[in-house]
């Protein structure tokens, strides 16, 4: 599939402050965690839900993200970098992928 | 060869830095520790992508311990023609000189 990729910004952008829901996870009790991201590390997102702060690993999970009025699904493996590395390494990773235009 | 798009990177980095410092400002009364983390992240991004943080934003947090200044946690005094901002968390003093307006001597 060729063409401009949607939501490239989201990989380089700040996730702090976004609404996020865990859609897929190898751990069943994590599915359905929904809330605002308050902090981020290399391997985890810290999500503030109604029941309190939850720490969810990025690898192997799929997230649903509300961003600029759109809803997107993003694989956690794509953002598995340190938050400050994500701009450089995230964009380069997409460039290396075959058939992706950014 | 694949090249980095540095213009794009620095544009995104600038957005993120400003956003994080603004957010730290909003959160400092809710969660002080988290607000500090936002400043720390903002500075990390700014240093890596060489984004300059403007002076008015730099003056919103302590340079040493990175806690944002909030009411009751900092002191501002004018001494010896300097503004002296003291952080009451770590005691670090930041001195900002006040320069008198330049007078044109030739006139």
UniProtKB/Swiss-Prot annotation, chain A:
Enzyme Commission number: 3.1.26.5
A single Gene Ontology CC term: cytoplasm
Compartments, as annotated in UniProt: Cytoplasm
Pfam family name, one: RNase_P-MRP_p29
Family annotation (Gene3D superfamilies): Ribonuclease P/MRP, subunit p29
Protein task: Part of ribonuclease P, a protein complex that generates mature tRNA molecules by cleaving their 5'-ends.
Designated name of the protein: Ribonuclease P protein component 1
Organism for this UniProt entry: Archaeoglobus fulgidus (strain ATCC 49558 / DSM 4304 / JCM 9628 / NBRC 100126 / VC-16)
Curated annotation (Swiss-Prot), chain B:
EC number: 3.1.26.5
Keyword rRNA-binding: no
Subunit details: Consists of a catalytic RNA component and at least 4-5 protein subunits.
Subcellular localization: Cytoplasm
GO cellular component terms, semicolon-separated: cytoplasm; ribonuclease P complex
Main EC class the enzyme belongs to: hydrolase
InterPro entries the record matches: RNP4, Rpr2/Snm1/Rpp21
Pfam families attached to this UniProt entry: Rpr2
Keyword flag tRNA processing: yes
Co-factor binding details: Binds 1 zinc ion per subunit.
A GO MF label: zinc ion binding
Family per record: Belongs to the eukaryotic/archaeal RNase P protein component 4 family.
Keywords of the record: Cytoplasm, Endonuclease, Hydrolase, Metal-binding, Nuclease, tRNA processing, Zinc
Protein name: Ribonuclease P protein component 4
């Amino acid at each position: 599939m060729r063409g401009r990729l949607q939501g490239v910004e989201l990989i380089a952008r700040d996730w702090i402050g976004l609404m996020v829901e865990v859609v897929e996870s190898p751990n069943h009790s994590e599915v359905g965690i929904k809330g605002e991201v308050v902090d981020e590390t290399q391997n985890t997102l810290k999500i503030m839900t109604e029941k309190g702060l939850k720490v969810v690993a990025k690898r192997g999970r799929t997230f649903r993200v509300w961003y600029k009025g759109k809803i997107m699904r993003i694989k956690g493996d794509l953002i598995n970098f340190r938050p400050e590395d994500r701009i450089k390494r995230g964009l380069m990773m997409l460039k290396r992928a075959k058939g992706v235009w950014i | 060869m694949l090249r980095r798009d540095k213009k794009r990177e620095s544009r995104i980095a600038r957005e993120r830095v400003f956003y994080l410092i603004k957010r730290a400002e909003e959160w400092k009364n809710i969660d002080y520790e988290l607000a500090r983390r936002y400043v720390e992240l903002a500075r990390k991004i700014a240093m890596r992508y060489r984004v300059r943080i403007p002076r008015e934003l730099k003056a919103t947090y302590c340079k040493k311990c990175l806690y944002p200044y909030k009411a009751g946690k900092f002191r501002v005094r004018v001494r010896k023609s300097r503004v002296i901002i003291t952080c009451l968390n770590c005691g670090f003093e930041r001195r900002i000189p006040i320069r008198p307006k330049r007078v044109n001597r030739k006139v």
